[in-house]
């Protein structure tokens, strides 16, 4: 189990592990594990692969409600399959608290908590410097380390080294630039909703979002959305059905910036109307993380 806050490279570390072990193990990723009725089929599938000579390395990435039965799956695997496989799990701290379940019946589990250290920060700087990726404004690693030392987020540190500014500074600059544009207000509203949803671990239906925003602007909302994807402000799925933020850490910076004087509970309420029904449990599990008028919010939801 790789467990840490967003921005520490959990998924990258897990995928790197699968890559490094690909000569011995066959990599798999489990996307959904929320229905106990299907667990037996999953176990039977991997049992069949093992009988064919494979050694599966199964990734369960970013625990949430869609993967809530992972604990039961592990118990079934260890009783029915027993050997020649490994399971790799990544989770944010608060999601582990919500979805870990009873760990007493799991026979063997190692929990890794990656945290950027001072020594690693120096090594990363040297590696990036040798590759020519350090921004000219960055002269040495210690000053950059001191800027991120409170949270020690890997993503913040690497961004600072390679771009010469903090993510929050870049976000502030981008938002000011958007605000000067005639389509700024509708772009801000789109970013509020998409990034808030991203921080809550869900993505939004593109059709639902466009339908809700179209009446608020005289401009073509589809073209606005496309331009925002081209500017790497949001990410649209390959089939075009869903839209999400680029990364939870980046999305949180945008949410904080765009809600400095805008009620967060209003965005939270709007997201409840846009989220898919199957995402409700994930969405509402993250609401306690935010400071907003819960009484007003839940009153709007009920009414």
What is each PLM-predicted segment?
Residues 9, 38-42, 68-69, 95-100, ...:
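Short, charged/polar "capping" segments at the starts of alpha-helices
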Residues 3-28, 43-51, 93-103, 176:
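P-loop NTPase Walker A phosphate-binding motif
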Residues 19-20, 76-77, 94-95, 192-196, ...:
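Amphipathic alpha-helical scaffolding segments
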Residues 44-48, 72-75, 98-106, 223-224, ...:
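Short, aromatic/basic amphipathic alpha-helical patches
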Residues 14, 115-202:
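Amphipathic alpha-helical "lid/sensor" segments that cap RecA-like P-loop NTPase cores
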């Amino acid at each position: 189990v790789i467990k840490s806050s967003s921005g520490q490279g959990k998924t990258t570390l897990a995928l790197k592990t699968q890559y490094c072990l690909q000569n011995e193990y066959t990599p798999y990723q489990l996307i959904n594990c929320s229905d106990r009725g299907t667990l037996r089929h999953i176990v039977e599938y991997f049992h069949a692969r093992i009988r064919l000579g494979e050694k599966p390395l199964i990734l369960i990435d970013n625990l949430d409600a869609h993967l809530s039965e992972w604990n039961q799956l592990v118990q079934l695997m260890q009783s029915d399959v027993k050997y020649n496989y490994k399971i790799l799990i990544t989770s944010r701290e608060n999601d582990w608290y919500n979805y870990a379940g009873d760990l007493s019946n799991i026979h063997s589990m190692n929990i890794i908590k990656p945290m950027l250290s001072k020594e690693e920060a120096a090594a990363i700087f040297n590696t990036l410097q040798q590759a020519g990726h350090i921004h000219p404004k960055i002269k040495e690693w210690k000053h950059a380390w001191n800027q991120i030392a409170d949270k020690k987020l890997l993503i913040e540190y690497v961004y600072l080294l390679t771009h010469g500014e903090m993510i929050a500074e870049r976000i502030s600059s981008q938002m000011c630039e958007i605000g000067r544009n005639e389509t700024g207000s509708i772009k801000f509203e789109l970013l509020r909703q998409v990034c808030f949803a991203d921080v809550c671990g869900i993505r939004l239906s593109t059709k639902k979002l466009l339908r809700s925003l179209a009446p608020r602007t005289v401009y073509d909302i589809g073209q606005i959305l496309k331009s925002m994807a081209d500017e790497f402000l949001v990410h649209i799925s390959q089939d075009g059905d869903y839209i999400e933020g680029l990364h939870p850490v980046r999305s949180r910076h945008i949410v904080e910036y765009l809600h400095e004087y805008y009620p967060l509970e209003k965005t939270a309420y709007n997201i409840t109307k846009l989220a898919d029904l199957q995402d409700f449990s994930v969405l509402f599990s993250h609401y306690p993380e935010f400071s907003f008028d819960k009484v007003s919010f839940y009153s709007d939801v009920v009414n």
